[in-house]
Amino acid sequence: MFYGSSSASMSLPSKNRLKRQSRTFTQVLYRTLSYRDRRSVTDLPEQVRDDPAELSTQSSAPGVLKIFGDEISAGANYKSVLATPRSSAQELIKEALERYSLNKTSACNFVLCDVIGRFEGPDRRWRTECLRALGNNEKPLLLQDLWKPKEGFSRRFELRRRAEVEELAAKEKDTVTADINAQARKLQRNRAKGTMTLQHGSSFCRSLSETSLNLVGLPGEEPKRYYSTLPGPIRTRSARDSEIRKERDGGGVKHSLYQSPHLLLLQGYNQQDCLVYLLNREQHTVGQETASARPNICLSSPDVLPLHCRIRRAAQRRSSSDQRLLLEPVAHGNVLVNFMRIERPTPIRHGDLLSFGAHYIFLYKDPLSAKPLPAQTLTRLRTLAKLCDGESGGLPEKGDACRMCGAVLHEPAASSRRSSKAPARGSQKRKLALEFERAHEDALVNRVLTLIEPSGDDHKLTPAYLLCLCIKHSANTFPPGSFGKLLQKIAKRIQTIAWEKTKELAQKQAQHQDPASLSLLSISDLVPDLQFIFFWMSNAIEILYFIQQKSPAYMQTIELMDDKAGSKESLLSATISANEEAMTILEEVIMYTFQQCVYYITKTLYVVLPGLLDCNPFGTEPSSEQCRRAAGVCVCAVCVMPEAVRRVVSVFQTTSDLLQQYQVHSEIQSQMFAYLFFFTNVSLFNQLIDKGPARGWFQRSRVLQIQASVKILLDWAKGAGHNHLAQKFFAKFCSTVTILASPPQQLSQMSWKALCAEHPSLKPVQLHRILTQYQLMAELGPLPIWQPSSEDEAYIYRTVDLLESFENHPPIVLPSAGFKVDLESDCVEDSIYRQLLYVRHFVWGLRTKTHPSNGCTDRQDAQREPPQPHSSPHPAPSVRGEGEGEVRSSSTTLGGRGEGAGAEDRTRDKPTHGIHYRNGSGARYANQSQATDSSCILTPPNTPLYPEHTYIQSNTAHYPEHASQEHTHTHSHTKTNGCMRSTPEHKKINGFISNGIEGPLSGCGFPFPVPVSHLGPKSDDICSVFVVDLDKGPYGLGMGLIDGLHTPLNSPGIYIRTLIPDGPAAADGRLCIGDRILAVNGTSLIGADYQSAVDLIRLGGGRLRFLVAKSDLEVSEKISASSC
């Protein structure tokens, strides 16, 4: 008999129908077969017997699976479903639910169980011996063929509720096996490490978690790392972790920490706590192990409940590929996320700190996110380490953070000291200037707009400064009216970037439209995207003001020019139109970004504001007590607030931090908080009036709680400097709460006219509704004194005015003063000037591509016309602007000298000063007093300016490669520019250099490193080619590079131009000025230009490996004599 595969649309035929089909099929065979065959067919059901060990299947009815459902439907024995060996447990659950008249969509709440048991007693009652829940993808029929029950036992498949199965699993406890294995592991560890070393000061009567943060040895003693997830010499923990993981995962599959989310224990309760807990299941239970409960994550602290919380995977949306984990606390379970108590399912993110009870603190890590820990998490970890070490026992020190929320504690004295020191550091009077050619305008604008990462540490107004310098140079240098086109380019590019960022944010937040997802939305989810929007809003405001102030002066050049055939009028008109269009676009960008920020911030307020009306600030919350106890004297006002109020204030505080971090204009900051306060006031007032009677908010006890919560909110606004805005926009809600909180004896003495005068923000219909509800709650009779006046009586029936409208929000007004971008200022912050030097390098790179220096033409000319011998190369022109200041170190002058406009016409050939040799090996260092251009030094741009280092972004372009040859090619080796070079017969083997240096030659000769025999009699310890590993320091590598084409060497190659004393490169001791960099991290630099080489070093990571070739004295002198 043949049955098709099971599907959701098939239903099981009745027994009579099955018998008819079987009888018909048998009769057909009976008519067509011989008598012997007829007898075998008819006798087949009698010969095949059912297996008594398998109760869910029958040999006489293959393809039919009996699923027993006593646990979900009382009185129901079993239901039959069609199944094949390929049918999965999940599909069979759906079919069985349909047979049991249950909804198939709830299949996730049920599980198919493989149950082993037997019948006992005269009434043959089923007794379960073993139960195992099948996975969704397991195949019951295949499982049945591979594993058979023990003799005397039978198997059947049961449908049970998932929660009941998990509860049964939690009650099981195996203490014997755990104790035996624990003792074996202990003996194994003792044998592996020999004599056990006790921690200094430890006591046998004290129980301390091995994974706590305060395991610090004696001063000067190397810390003992007992257990760690990082590679190291101690390996005893790995065996224990693997065994624990094998026990918890069934011993079948090993899960890597780099593949699964996990909890890393930061602070535990005793030494039996595990260091890592993998979160590789659909759901994990956290709790204390008892006789009746055995959770997945067992914690031994006495304040942890048997079922403390759950960690489960959230339902994955089709539009999202990532899987989020939800932390679900149970009733009376103390669970904190980032030191904030939660009472509802909360999504946890990579880097969150989870606290269970009063002792356990975990770090949640998700390796799949491939992101570093957030900065706020690192701040919390540093603060937690100080807390565990007991270093901060009193008032918080400068730069400390709140131990509850991780926020940086601002000290007024420290801020004043920083502000007083700022002018002293910027007193170098560096004048800002940026020169470029008109042909490079588009490339320069695009580079400036992508230069700064909004989430980085650079000055947030750097794009505004650099773009205003571009506008200034265009207006003063290029033909009249050229700056108008530049304004349009800048405005349109900023508009495009702002729209793209807001569009990305809208697409991300589209998934939070349903109420369930919207309830999980928090302000921290929006911060990464809001950073971009605040960044460009702030820069657009500064650029708009610069255009408004400087455009009239720039247009005067057009008015003063000679009028030729009416060209002046048309040019002036076109420039004015372009100027107005650019300002209009920037105004739209400011308005649009402001509206988008307000929209998403109010969206988070919409989620947290209802809790403010239900909050009881007079109750004691464990999180607040823990904060006060941990901080001693906590100056962070947010962490001691009640939970509901803290959520609202967190939105305001995060917004304030973003506005200040991105240096948004102070007037725009005030306007944004005016709108947020307006939204909060209207939302709270409308909910109180609309839902107050049903929710009991008009009861005086509840009103007093609301009044206390609002007072906390207003106190925060006052401390944040927004007191006048809060008093203005919270007037209506505060008036309502004040009336409802007044005692009946006092309020009944006030007339309607007096109430209207004292609370002018309330409309007559609103005041009438409030007094009516007050009468009902206070059980007061009619009060004639509250009767509306004749002029107000007509308005009390206008219910359209009862609730406030969100359309009457405060307007957005662009500021007119108080801007920060000032190009004429003599004191400029180091970060801005550092980026300016970087952009000057970028412009210099564009110039060298367009106009090759040093007498070099393009590649074709170089190949077509070989350079003449004894030719004198021309020096590279200067690219330093007028008034460029000096950059000083303690003993090294690295800044460029201020030069006039004629500096570009001067030669730069300079003799080498102060070159000396060490041990006769040819190690050379430039004199510390030698003046060099600071823009030549290779160091990340976000480092301090003492000494100043900059680098060039990748802008790949290969320079012409040619060699100035002073001798013929008849020799086996020729010496060019002081370096030994092989002839074509010796320099290439299978496309690679024959002396072992990897990398294609691109068909061009290049200076080879000097062999050992040519370095002198005392150079036995020097190799011609060697490998150097350097770690980037706080100021980068401390090494400046230069392309040999732009030196008197006149040959391509990347050479060391500068070594900063005490830098990583100089500290290595092997690198010298003039040495050539052949490769970086295995990537050849032969044939690469300067910008590509610097970009490769920049993106190479914190540790770089260089292949370096030694150069002789002649090459070093030419490199040293060059100017950057």
From Swiss-Prot:
<keyword id="KW-0130">Cell adhesion</keyword>
<dbReference type="InterPro" id="IPR037983">
    <property type="entry name" value="CBD_Rasip1/Radil"/>
</dbReference>
<dbReference type="InterPro" id="IPR052072">
    <property type="entry name" value="Vascular_dev_regulator"/>
</dbReference>
<feature type="region of interest" description="Disordered">
    <location>
        <begin position="960"/>
        <end position="982"/>
    </location>
</feature>
<dbReference type="GO" id="GO:0034446">
    <property type="term" value="P:substrate adhesion-dependent cell spreading"/>
</dbReference>
<dbReference type="Pfam" id="PF00595">
    <property type="entry name" value="PDZ"/>
</dbReference>
<dbReference type="Pfam" id="PF00788">
    <property type="entry name" value="RA"/>
</dbReference>
<dbReference type="InterPro" id="IPR029071">
    <property type="entry name" value="Ubiquitin-like_domsf"/>
</dbReference>
<dbReference type="GO" id="GO:0051020">
    <property type="term" value="F:GTPase binding"/>
</dbReference>
<comment type="similarity">
    <text>Belongs to the RADIL family.</text>
</comment>
<comment type="function">
    <text>Downstream effector of Rap required for cell adhesion and migration of neural crest precursors during development.</text>
</comment>
<feature type="compositionally biased region" description="Polar residues">
    <location>
        <begin position="926"/>
        <end position="937"/>
    </location>
</feature>
<feature type="domain" description="Dilute">
    <location>
        <begin position="516"/>
        <end position="809"/>
    </location>
</feature>
<protein>
    <recommendedName>
        <fullName>Ras-associating and dilute domain-containing protein</fullName>
    </recommendedName>
</protein>
<dbReference type="Pfam" id="PF00498">
    <property type="entry name" value="FHA"/>
</dbReference>
<dbReference type="InterPro" id="IPR002710">
    <property type="entry name" value="Dilute_dom"/>
</dbReference>
<dbReference type="InterPro" id="IPR008984">
    <property type="entry name" value="SMAD_FHA_dom_sf"/>
</dbReference>
<dbReference type="InterPro" id="IPR000253">
    <property type="entry name" value="FHA_dom"/>
</dbReference>
<feature type="compositionally biased region" description="Basic and acidic residues">
    <location>
        <begin position="960"/>
        <end position="969"/>
    </location>
</feature>
<feature type="domain" description="Ras-associating">
    <location>
        <begin position="61"/>
        <end position="164"/>
    </location>
</feature>
<feature type="region of interest" description="Disordered">
    <location>
        <begin position="226"/>
        <end position="253"/>
    </location>
</feature>
<dbReference type="GO" id="GO:0001755">
    <property type="term" value="P:neural crest cell migration"/>
</dbReference>
<keyword id="KW-0217">Developmental protein</keyword>
<feature type="region of interest" description="Disordered">
    <location>
        <begin position="850"/>
        <end position="942"/>
    </location>
</feature>
<feature type="domain" description="PDZ">
    <location>
        <begin position="1027"/>
        <end position="1112"/>
    </location>
</feature>
<dbReference type="GO" id="GO:0007165">
    <property type="term" value="P:signal transduction"/>
</dbReference>
<comment type="subunit">
    <text>Interacts with RAP1A; in a GTP-dependent manner.</text>
</comment>
<feature type="compositionally biased region" description="Basic and acidic residues">
    <location>
        <begin position="903"/>
        <end position="912"/>
    </location>
</feature>
<dbReference type="Pfam" id="PF01843">
    <property type="entry name" value="DIL"/>
</dbReference>
<feature type="domain" description="FHA">
    <location>
        <begin position="284"/>
        <end position="342"/>
    </location>
</feature>
<dbReference type="InterPro" id="IPR036034">
    <property type="entry name" value="PDZ_sf"/>
</dbReference>
<feature type="compositionally biased region" description="Basic and acidic residues">
    <location>
        <begin position="238"/>
        <end position="252"/>
    </location>
</feature>
<feature type="compositionally biased region" description="Pro residues">
    <location>
        <begin position="866"/>
        <end position="876"/>
    </location>
</feature>
<dbReference type="GO" id="GO:0005874">
    <property type="term" value="C:microtubule"/>
</dbReference>
<dbReference type="InterPro" id="IPR000159">
    <property type="entry name" value="RA_dom"/>
</dbReference>
<dbReference type="InterPro" id="IPR001478">
    <property type="entry name" value="PDZ"/>
</dbReference>
